[in-house]
Amino acid sequence: MREIVLDTETTGFDPESGDRIVEIGAVELWNHVATGETYHVYINPERSMPDEAFGVHGIGPDLLDNPRPPEKGEVTLKDKPVFAKVGQGFLDFIQDSKLVIHNASFDMKFLNAELRWMGLPQIPMDQALDTLAIARKRFPGSPASLDALCRRFNIDNTNRVLHGALLDSEILAEVYLELIGGRQPDFGLSTSAASGAGGQDDWRPTARPTPLASKITDEERAAHEAFVEKLGENALWTRA
């Protein structure tokens, strides 16, 4: 089974208000195992970059109202292709595979808006699997952001200083496999027991309040002692 773990970065929250996609990142899974195949592209949104969005992902310093050269980790967009140049290639990559997305409704509305403006086929909503919904169902009332799930599953996200579509997809792939129990399943053992930490040394049987009475009769005990005495030096427990 092929799945595509996907993320986008945008200029804002609403494509119908003129916001656009500026980055797409995706990771391919086969039978819940990463293949190493990825899709990654930066996109010129053909508009300015709001300061708020830039603060999230650091993409497009050359499109700010006060344009400037990029600093470390920032990516310029004026020299990148517009969506019309990459849309078909994106569809060719995902094909009809299930799309694993965190907060899928957000990314899907942007992807389908961009595809609609190009006159390309829309992606059916049921092709997307929302890991945010899965997390909220599994852990009701708990934080379900990508960062929160990384903390829950002890997934290293120290490189995630700014949002980035490909990095977030790689992290989400690990989170997704944890959510479905597919990453190093422990057959119901706790994490500490499975890793060897907090194992048998931490477990102690509870003392029985009333000791059990022996069910061996006096005759049986005498017969056993006579049998042991008869074995003498041939007993296994006397051998070196």
Which ranges hold each PLM region?
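Conserved non-catalytic scaffold segment of RNase H-like nuclease domains
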Residues: 1-125, 136-139, 148-162
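A ubiquitous structural signal for well-ordered alpha-helices
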Residues: 86-89, 175, 227
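Alpha-helix initiation and N-capping motif
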Residues: 87, 143-146, 221-224
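Acidic, Mg2+-coordinating catalytic module of metal-dependent nucleases/exonucleases
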Residues: 98-105, 110, 114-115, 145-205
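Acidic two-metal-ion nuclease catalytic site recognized across multiple nuclease folds
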Residues: 177-240
